[in-house]
């Protein structure tokens, strides 16, 4: 699928506080129903009022977003190229695009290291922002190709925060794998989803936290409303 670029154009003058890459697992363990829950859950999370408010409320620049799907060694597909989210209309277009994407790959293994490498390449050519974050979502451990450790050695990820959204299911080791090998950087965290059914709520929590990360811990930090 061709990458989509909407929203405000990325210019050298545009002030950006956060460059956020969302990496979605579409490996063989994700069936068609689970894929739809993930796809629609992401769109709904980005559309959540609290997340919208967090994106648009920032006083120190905009949020830039890129989204890709990943699976095996050579299976990475960009669905939303770098887009500045500076208005509700920008967010509306991104939500519409993400809600209507088609699955890129089926039946391939789980290559977390390669996905991190691809995310690093996106950040390298992306906007210059105050913070750079990769949001890795997955339901399994690395089972093909090089792992996260090799990716961190060979790609320019030194100043990048990598967080994880773990989809709990049949693989009992996936949470420990993400905590031990995937997340990286000061303040990095793992968000848990109770199966794919919980993906929407987990992604909403995760986006809200990542976008507000510079304020968390302060007395006046924003809080996610009970309904997201």
For each predicted feature, which ranges?
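Exposed acidic/Ser/Thr-rich ligand/metal-binding surfaces
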Residues: 106-157, 208, 228
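Von Willebrand factor A/integrin I-like adhesion domains
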Residues: 172-217
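Short beta-strand-loop
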Residues: 58-98, 174-181
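Bacterial N-terminal signal peptides
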Residues: 1-8
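Von Willebrand factor
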Residues: 15-81, 85, 89-132, 134-137, 163-174, ...
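Second-shell loop/turn segments in exported
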Residues: 23-33, 65, 81-84, 98-109, ...
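VWA/integrin I-like adhesion module and closely mimicked acidic/polar interface patches used
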Residues: 55, 140-181
């Amino acid at each position: 699928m061709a990458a989509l670029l909407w929203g405000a154009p990325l210019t050298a003058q545009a002030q950006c506080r956060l460059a956020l890459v969302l990496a979605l697992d579409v490996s063989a363990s994700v069936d068609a129903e689970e894929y739809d829950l993930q796809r629609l859950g992401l769109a709904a999370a980005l559309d959540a009022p609290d997340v919208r408010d967090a994106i648009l409320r920032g006083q120190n620049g905009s949020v830039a977003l890129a989204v890709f799907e990943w699976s095996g060694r050579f299976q990475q597909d960009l669905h939303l190229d770098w887009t500045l989210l500076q208005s509700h209309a920008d967010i509306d277009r991104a939500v519409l695009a993400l809600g209507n994407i088609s699955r890129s790959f089926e039946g391939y293994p789980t290559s977390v290291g390669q996905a991190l490498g691809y995310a690093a390449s996106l950040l390298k050519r992306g906007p210059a922002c105050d913070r750079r974050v990769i949001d890795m979502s997955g339901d399994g451990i690395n089972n093909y190709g090089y792992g996260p450790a090799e990716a961190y050695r060979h790609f320019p990820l030194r100043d990048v925060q990598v967080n994880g959204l773990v989809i709990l299911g049949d693989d009992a080791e996936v949470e420990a794998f993400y905590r031990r090998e995937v997340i990286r950087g000061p303040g990095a965290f793992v968000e848990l989803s109770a199966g794919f059914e919980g993906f929407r709520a987990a992604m909403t929590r995760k986006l809200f936290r990542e976008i507000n990360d510079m304020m968390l811990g302060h007395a006046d930090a924003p809080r996610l409303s009970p309904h997201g």
